[in-house]
From Swiss-Prot:
Domain of life: Eukaryota
Positions of post-translational 1-thioglycine modification: G109
Natural source organism: Neurospora crassa (strain ATCC 24698 / 74-OR23-1A / CBS 708.71 / DSM 1257 / FGSC 987)
GO biological process, one term: tRNA thio-modification
Family: Belongs to the URM1 family.
Gene: urm1
Residue(s) of cross-link: Glycyl lysine isopeptide (Gly-Lys) (interchain with K-? in acceptor proteins): G109
Gene3D superfamilies cross-referenced by the UniProt entry: 3.10.20.30
Annotated GO CC locations: cytosol; nucleus
Pathway terms, separated by semicolons: tRNA modification; 5-methoxycarbonylmethyl-2-thiouridine-tRNA biosynthesis
Protein name stated in the entry: Ubiquitin-related modifier 1
MF terms (GO), sorted A to Z: protein tag activity
Pfam families membership: Urm1
HAMAP family reported in the protein's UniProt record: Urm1 (MF_03048)
Length: 109
């Protein structure tokens, strides 16, 4: 029997609007992420954002994606094609097969 702490969830994460530059210039990522955070709570989108910064981000400019540990204003997050504001935002608990899309609306000028 496998330990619940070792369980993983298979999801896809996509980046658009220039965010892919922060993640090896790759727009689509098929990931297996821990099913629980360090406190043993079910992994949610807030956990995923931190996880992406720690494990997938290759660019040192994390502030282009997060500010103060939260998703930077101007970045849209869609959970299974729905605005995350309709899905409890960063409290949404990840489910196997979820597709999380981050889109930057920030533009230089």
């Amino acid at each position: 029997m496998s330990d619940q702490k070792d369980q993983m969830i298979d999801i896809t994460v996509d980046f658009s609007g220039g965010l892919e530059i922060l993640f090896s210039n790759q727009k689509h990522h098929a990931l297996s992420v821990p099913a629980q955070d360090a406190q043993g709570k079910p992994a949610n989108v807030g956990f995923l954002i931190n996880y992406l910064c720690q494990t997938l981000m290759t660019d040192p400019r994390a502030d282009l994606f997060v500010l103060g540990g939260e998703l930077r204003p101007g970045i849209l997050c869609l959970i299974n094609d729905c605005d995350w504001e309709l899905e409890e935002e960063d409290a949404y608990v990840l489910q196997p097969g979820d597709n999380i899309l981050f889109i930057s609306t920030l533009h230089g000028g």
